[in-house]
Amino acid sequence: MTDLIPQRLALLIDIDNGSAAAIDGVLAELERYGRSDIRLGFGDYEHTSAAWREACIRCAIELRHYPVLAMGSKNAADIALVIAAMDLLHGGGVDGFAIVSSDTDFVRLGTRIREAGLPVYGFGPWGTSERFRKACTRFLFSENLMPDTPAHPAIIGRRPLQEPRDAGNEIRDAIARLHPGVGGWVGVEDLDRELVRHAPDFDPRTYGKRTLLELLKAQRRLTVSQYPVGHWRVRLMSGASKVGGI
């Protein structure tokens, strides 16, 4: 997804605003970018769900306890997460950050890390604010990372997947930015990067497809071809440049 492939990632989890059911998917996703050698969770241990306590033990996540003693201290865990992130950022030794939360309080943290030249991978539910999603280099909806089984009741009632055609305009616009006009070929890898650059939360899984290539093949007004073996390209068909043409 990105040209910068960090080798050592710091995973910071806002326990109060993250889903334990998605943690395995989060860790699997992070393997695409590097190693999550540092794994820290922040929250009130006494009020932390059994699912999170089990996940922290199983996934070697250090849970840092910040009790909610009064209304005035309800943000103690959030503040601790930010302090830990700044310590890691200025101490060096990490190549990127992953933040699990839906809290808009971390918007500035995300932009600050990116200003320092490091990528930020965000993870949160459908309801995560657009501001936080756009503050990340890449944002993944936790619902897209959960196994769709009865063993995970947290995903019951999840938002229905969008139809592949719902991604049409976004795909068309990205192709047009890379190659204005109709008929010009664009590499699928280049298109992938452009889609995420413009919309960090773009994910084929939101539209029911595992990969971008599968999503492209499901579009009506695109031509997809292989060149040479193992490399794919795509172009707009005549008439696809109109709104709703894909």
Residue ranges and their predicted role:
Residues 59, 116, 134-136:
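Short, structured coil segments at secondary-structure junctions
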Residues 118, 126, 151-246:
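N-terminal regulatory modules in eukaryotic regulatory proteins
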Residues 130-142, 147:
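Contiguous mid-protein beta-loop-alpha structural module that forms a pocket-lining wall or clamp
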Residues 110, 116-119:
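P-loop/Walker A NTP-binding module and the surrounding RecA-like catalytic core of P-loop NTPases
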Residues 1-90, 119:
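Domain-level signal for Mg2+-assisted phosphodiester chemistry and nucleotide/NA-binding surfaces
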